């Protein structure tokens, strides 16, 4: 029975040599995630949902979730369940992380083993704050990782439905599209907004190109809009407010307050995105490799500016990782806001460059990542976890754009970069030890 279902969905049970290697990487990734997730502690809201909310039966669970004051019905309910069962929490998070890894491999068509391994490594390298708030924190994981998993599943089934010829397979895939696209909207507000717009955009592009729309696309659009409607209208209809949610994710009322919020949130976005050292480093390395073809480039000045910006962001990201995040200065938001503008300009330049060289998918993904930031500039509050979707989409763009040859050359550069960083860290550590010993001696003498 199970084999027939998989066959109808379009995934073959018998794997080629490449698929076997892919399965090995997926298994290794799953085991690693299971170990990590098992030992991650409960933090922040996890402790509140575990010890501050008394749930004695399913009626208490439904009543709390439905009247909590926001539309994160599946996110909040799953957190309440998982914080009460350690093994279920570790197992479910490991399975979902591995599933996202597998979906990236399939959707981005990563056929080479090196590309597969590189995707798994980069998945584990968001900023430190994102990692803590999204991978470790169960509430963050459920509200920001699970919707990505569900929507990627919907897109995967939608893609398979385009290739399906049997009616039974089309019906099964159509049901899967709806059952993943609609629930994906019931976790976090920024994911809901982006997924709804993405689904409508997919439908609009299909109508524009083909002058018609397929049934699977209609199901995707309807499911996304229906889920977004429940997410948005649910709290207003139920009129619940048990968690002080009435002022959550609100837009300022005055124009002056809007500009002030844009400045503050832009600085926060610059800070949180700057911490993604892996992303900026690999993009800077790819830019430097492209300089070899500079004599063939008609827009040499723009290419050179992009390379300078990429190397600058990578360098600042390393400094930020080591020390800058601990620096407290009155004018530091100005620095981060400027870096945010550089980040956005750099990504716009990359999107335009992808279009020029014929990598339309990477260009669209890069632009989509930029779009996810814009709504967050005018709402409060924001934190590192809300920018995870932005980082994830940019990660997809990098994986989609990079070739096997470019990846091999990048790994050589990354090795040299890591050696340089290691040498720098050793010097910093030795200096800290020396100053620490001097301070200790001075305190003893005193």
Regions found by a protein language model. Name each.
Residues 94-115, 153:
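Transmembrane-helix motifs of polytopic, lipid-linked glycan transferases
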Residues 102-106, 153-160, 198-207, 281-287, ...:
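Transmembrane alpha-helices and membrane-interface helical segments
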Residues 72, 121-159, 188, 328-347, ...:
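Membrane-interface micro-motifs in multi-pass membrane enzymes
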